[in-house]
Amino acid sequence: LMIKLADLLRKNAQDNILIIIAPRHIRRSMSIQNRVKSAGFDIKCRSKGDYPSKNDKFYLSDTMGEMGSLIEVADLVYVAGSMVPVGGHSPSEASQFGKPVIMGPHSEKCNAQIKDLVWSGGAIQIEKGPKMNENFLNNITELIGNNDRLEDMGKNSLIASGYAQQRADEASIHLLELLNKSNKQDVA
């Protein structure tokens, strides 16, 4: 899908975009490199000490512990694992950095957070269907270069991350109250 995106961006003269791929499983690094290269693109890899330059289209962040830095410099974050039925990955880091999020229909592992993000306008969730990939690509190309919309989405994403934190805080307080109550009953 990212290769199709790069092709589409090139055709639309939006080829000043760097697509950063940060695989959840680093063991997929060589496979990703081969797929990108076989599509006619060069790819730079963090594990080789490469850094992206102005004309690069793909950068593979195949090392651990750098997701925050990558998200911080991103204009838009695509949450992978959401276009296929694997439960979806969490957009929490992206929203905590106030970044606009785009993801597919599979968000089973983080439904409440996705609902908050979409409701707040901080994310776009592509609906499942025969035109899912096409809709994904169209949404991204519409967002790229629309700095006002990206900025608004980023602000909304940050607000939505506050909702998630508030829910977590409330759940923690409730659990502590239950634990406290249980301990008092055990003592009596």
Walk through the language-model features, giving the residues of each.
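Nucleotide-activated sugar donor-binding and catalytic core shared by glycosyltransferases
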Residues: 1-188
